[in-house]
From Swiss-Prot:
Domain OBG-type G: 160-327
This protein's name: GTPase Obg
Organism: Rickettsia typhi (strain ATCC VR-144 / Wilmington)
Superkingdom assignment: Bacteria
Binding site for GTP: 166-173, 191-195, 212-215, 279-282, 308-310
GO biological process: ribosome biogenesis
Function according to Swiss-Prot or TrEMBL: An essential GTPase which binds GTP, GDP and possibly (p)ppGpp with moderate affinity, with high nucleotide exchange rates and a fairly low GTP hydrolysis rate. Plays a role in control of the cell cycle, stress response, ribosome biogenesis and in those bacteria that undergo differentiation, in morphogenesis control.
Compartments reported by the entry: Cytoplasm
Assembly and oligomerization: Monomer.
CDD domains the record matches: Obg (cd01898)
C-alpha cells in the first residue's frame, strides 16, 4: 500500500430539501387547508478516526465528497427524508487544515473520535406554515438551505512515542527490526527506507511505539533528500533516538548534520529529549569506540551510548532508557 500523508480534498454538505405546496384533498371537503410538508435536513460531513487505517491513500484518487441532499416535503404534512451524513474515516494523527493550510480545524489524536466539519442544510418550510387569518390558502413555501462547501487539507502526523533519526544507512531500520516485529526493507545503501515505518516495543507488560523516519541529509529542512517530507511524523514523539554510524570517519559532522536539520525544521524537534547512540560498534575496536564516544560527549555534553544492532550490544539498555523517559513524561 502507498504511504500518503497529505492530500487536498473538496467536501460539501447535503442541501436541505424544499418545502412543499399542497392542499388537503378529501371527498366532500370542498376547500381543504394547506398541508405541504417541510423539506428534510441535508446530510452532514463527518470525519472519524480509525486505527485500522494508517495512510490517506483513499483520498488521493477520489477528491470530491458530497453528503446526501434532504428530500423535498410532500402533501399530507409529510416531511422530506433527511439526507444521509457522509462519514470519512482517517488515520489517528490526521490533522484537518483550511484551504490555505494556515488554520488547524481539528487534530485526531485518539481512536473512534468524530468531528462534524460541515452541517447539512436545513429543510425548507411547507405552505402549511404560512396560513394566516387573511390567507387561508397560501401558495408559499421556502427552499432548502444550501449547505456549506470547502476545500481542505488532510495532513497525517504519525503517533509514536519514540522517533529514530540519523543519516541514511545509520542502521535505523535494523534497529527497528531488532526491537520490534516490524519488517522494514533493509539494505546496505542510502535511502533504503522511503516511507516511515512503525513498530511496537514490548517490555515487561509495557509497550511503546517507535517510528523509523527516512534518513536525513544536509538541507533536508529545505526539501533535499527524503527527510523534509517526514520530519513532521516525529514532532509528536516523546524522545528521539539518534543513531550515528560508528564506521563513519567523522561522527561529529554526522551528528551536527542531523541536529541542524532537526533544529531548522521546528522548535518542537529542537527541544526533544535525545538519546545518542554510536551504532555498528561490532566493526570497531574498543579503543575506537571510546575515542568516538569521547569526541561526541565533548561536543554534545550528553551521554553517548555504544550499540550494535548486529550483535545486540547495548540495544536493550537503550529501549529501557526510552521507556523510562516516556513514563516520566506522561
Amino acid at each position: 500500500m502507498h504511504f500518503i500523508d497529505e492530500v487536498k480534498i473538496y467536501i460539501k454538505g447535503g442541501n436541505g430539501g424544499n418545502g412543499c405546496i399542497s392542499f388537503h384533498r378529501e371527498k366532500f371537503v370542498d376547500r381543504g387547508g394547506p398541508d405541504g410538508g417541510d423539506g428534510g435536513f441535508g446530510g452532514s460531513v463527518i470525519f472519524r478516526s480509525n486505527h485500522h487505517i494508517n495512510t490517506l491513500v483513499n483520498y488521493r484518487y477520489q477528491q470530491h465528497f458530497i453528503a446526501e441532499n434532504g428530500g423535498n416535503g410532500k402533501g399530507s404534512n409529510r416531511s422530506g427524508k433527511s439526507g444521509k451524513s457522509l462519514i470519512l474515516d482517517v488515520p489517528i494523527g490526521t490533522q484537518i487544515f483550511s484551504e490555505d493550510g494556515n488554520i488547524l480545524l481539528h487534530d485526531f489524536t485518539e481512536d473512534e473520535k468524530s468531528f462534524e466539519i460541515i452541517k447539512g442544510g436545513c429543510g425548507g418550510l411547507g405552505n402549511s406554515h404560512f396560513k394566516t387569518s387573511v390567507n387561508q390558502a397560501p401558495r408559499k413555501r421556502t427552499e432548502g438551505e444550501i449547505a456549506q462547501e470547502m476545500w481542505i487539507h488532510l495532513r497525517l502526523k504519525l503517533l509514536s512515542d519514540v522517533g529514530l533519526v540519523g543519516l541514511p544507512n545509520a542502521g535505523k531500520s535494523t534497529f527497528l527490526s531488532v526491537v520490534t516485529a516490524a519488517k522494514p526493507k533493509i539494505a546496505d545503501y542510502p535511502f533504503t527506507t522511503l516511507v516511515p515505518n512503525l513498530g511496537v516495543v514490548y517490555i515487561n507488560d509495557e509497550e511503546f511505539v517507535i517510528a523509523d523516519i527516512p534518513g536525513l541529509i544536509a538541507g533536508a529542512h529545505q526539501g533535499h533528500g527524503l527527510g523534509d517530507k517526514f520530519l513532521k511524523h516525529i514532532e509528536r514523539c516523546n524522545v528521539l533516538i539518534h543513531l550515528i554510524d560508528g564506521s563513519s570517519h567523522n561522527v561529529i559532522a554526522d551528528y551536527d548534520t542531523v541536529r541542524f536539520e532537526l533544529e531548522s525544521y521546528s522548535d518542537y524537534l529542537k527541544n526533544k529529549i535525545e538519546i545518542i547512540c554510536i551504532n555498528k560498534c561490532d566493526v570497531l575496536t574498543d579503543e575506537e569506540i571510546q575515542k568516538k564516544i569521547k569526541k561526541l560527549q565533548r561536543v554534545t555534553n550528553k551521554v553517548v551510548h555504544p550499540i550494535s544492532t548486529y550483535t545486540n550490544l547495548g540495544v536493550n539498555k537503550i529501549v529501557k532508557l526510552a521507556l523510562e523517559i516516556i513514563k516520566n513524561q506522561i
